Amino acid sequence: MTSQYSNYSCPLNNIQVNVIGSSRTSDDHFLEQMLTKRKKTNISQDLHYLLLGLNPRELYQISFKLARIDEKKYKFNGNFNEGDYYPHKNSEIPMEDTEEIVHSDGYQTGARWMKTGVYFPKIGISKEQPDKERCLLLESLHAYFPVLVFTTSSGISLEVPVWSQKFVTTMTSSNRSVKRREKRKLEETAGPAAKKTPDIIETTPEDVVPEVYNAQYFYQMQNNTVISSESKFSSPLALQQDLTEDFGTFAQLDAHFNVSVQSCSSSSLSSPAALKHDSTVSSDSDFDDKNSEEFDAVFEYIDQQFSNHDQNPMDQQSKSIDLNQTTWAPQSINNPGYLSTASSPAALNQDSSASEKSSIVRDKKSDENCLDEFDRVFNELDQQFTPKEDQVQDLSNCTTWNQEPINNSIQSNQFINPELFYFIFHKCLIISWPSCLSCCRGSILPQHLRTPPLVPISQLLIISPLVLPPYHNFTTGSATVSPFASTPANMTIFNFTSDSSTTYSNSTTAQVFPDVANTPDLSYFNIAPAVDLSLFIDPFVQSGRDLSIERSIRNFTNTLKKAHRQKKTAILTFQSTEPMQLEFKYCTKMLLRTDKPVGNFSIQLSGPYLEHLLNLSHHLCRFSEYNLFVKAHFPRGSYGSLTSMTGPAVEIPETQENITIIWVKKDFPENVNKYPVAINSLITEAIASNGTNQVLLTSKYPSDCTIRFRKCGFMIEGVLVVKKKETVIIDRQILGELNRLKHDLLQ
């Protein structure tokens, strides 16, 4: 399987399917019930799925079908509250999958499927040969589960089972089968005229209920309560007598569970003493239906409280938030008055119906609740990792460093909740390879995330100038190249040339230079090697042009592989009939953006970057389509193309120690249009040589600015102030501490 899809940057076998609005897992053996009849009936399940792990640039067609779980025929176990089924005998019908129903949207990109999910509405089932479209033939009393079939544009298909959805098909009603059986007997004795007789056929409960309702076992399993084995559990009175034998009176039972049933408006349930009095004056013979319903309501409510208390704390909290918007909220069992909200058994029944309605609302708003849960988790992380005022150090006088690192509190022992960390990784689609792997040592991560990158994380440089509106004008800065006259650096250098400071030229080039000493006036951007070079097209681009660009991306990927095998340089060139706007991003943080459109653009890659792009791209693209991408805004009515080629090899030396820079923010004066702009970003150089212990930061800025060091994914305010066109010397050890602890937890 792996070798079959090894040519793809994101293989098909990494696809994950989650059911939206369902809390069940693949280990849950509970089988939902679906009714089948001769005509078409819609599936009672909500066929809405969330997809992960698709290749964002690959075209997929998704189909739906049902498959048999096993070769067994199932039977109802008599548990009406849970509706569970169990294998009864081997089925004579061979195991065959149903026909596939293709999604009406046809072929769509993986980014679109992962963003919106896939939904199959109005799919019907029938127990006879269906005569309508979008209807599947199923056999009664057999277990099925959904299967999603993914087909790529190249014809490769993969089936992904959805084990969290399992159901058994049953007939419409057992009463009808009994009536048909009785009518058949009448036809044999009285003749065909018996069909027209309107006599009502009486059926006994034994004919309707497949098995005896084992309420004793159900109550014992749900509440973990020891009940006398001699009890038949034939009525709530017998249940009460058994509880009285084990725990004493109802008052003692209340003390045992730390629950007190407070005043009820009904005379029969006014107090626990009244409950005891009713039990002493009643018997099996004179126990009426009214008291039976009241006891059932009380114990059903108690069961709900126990079941809500045993749930996952995170699920319980989200559930309590939703239910607070309705009529009642589940509370702790240790609260003595958690039953005081119901003044009567009728109120208990109303609360039960209200909880069912709220569960429906909760299922419909699952996406909103999920987003609220994300906000809550990241707010907690923000409060935990944001440094306090006494932890923020002044780095203006930074020639010496003898203090502890700022906010040096992110250690591996703080990630004590693997589920939460895994939750953040997969639900929020962390984009880049997390540098916190060095801190967490990969012990709490899933197996497919524990593979370390090919380069040390300390060598990854993330440069993140804050993208400001067009009126925030900057000028490019010049690098100090004297320390590098004999020491070349392994950097990807983007050289953006323009004929003036206010207008753009028709061409823009970007190349890899082996020696920075030969480029005295350039803007330096060191891209982390462990990223995937991909092209992302704006959503407003029409589908016709999108398909041509998709093919060009695949050709460029093949060019990268060819250049890597032949040890050559790959050149990526953009061409368009009209100028287009380009954006360079890394991990959704802007590296560079052109304010005005440019005509052509090319990137030259070689050396170890090709190896890192090819070997590590599959680790990153399984989380999101945004890694390192070039965003091309094609004007409406124009067409763009992407070409690639290979060139001669360019040797690049080993990477030096890199430094993390920084976000820049400035409150501009009112008259902001007087500064001409060439590129809408601040170019800040952080260059360190092997012979010095200091780093020079030079900023060509129209006014004073504040540079913030980004550490642990959060900002440290006001750590360094750079004056207008000033060069600041920063001790290397300070930057080393910041670089060692940086975490790319994107918000």
Swiss-Prot record:
* Location of the protein in the cell: Nucleus
User: What InterPro entries does the record point to?
Assistant: p53-like_TF_DNA-bd_sf, T-box_DNA-bd, T-box_sf, TF_T-box
Domain of life of the organism in this record? Answer: Eukaryota
Q: Which residue stretches does the UniProt record annotate as biased composition, category Polar residues? A: 332-358
Q: Does the keyword Transcription apply?
A: yes
DNA-binding region spans which residues?
33-199
GO cellular component assignments: chromatin; nucleus
Location of the region described as Disordered in the Swiss-Prot/TrEMBL record: 268-289, 332-364
Q: List the disulfide bonds.
A: none
Pfam families, sorted: T-box (PF00907)
Keyword Metal-binding belongs to the record: no
Annotated GO MF terms: DNA-binding transcription factor activity, RNA polymerase II-specific; RNA polymerase II cis-regulatory region sequence-specific DNA binding
Q: Which UniProt keywords apply?
A: DNA-binding, Nucleus, Transcription, Transcription regulation
Extract one GO BP annotation from the record.
regulation of transcription by RNA polymerase II
PANTHER family attached to this UniProt entry: T-BOX PROTEIN 31-RELATED, T-BOX PROTEIN-RELATED
Q: What is this protein called?
A: Putative T-box protein 31
Q: Which gene encodes it?
A: tbx-31
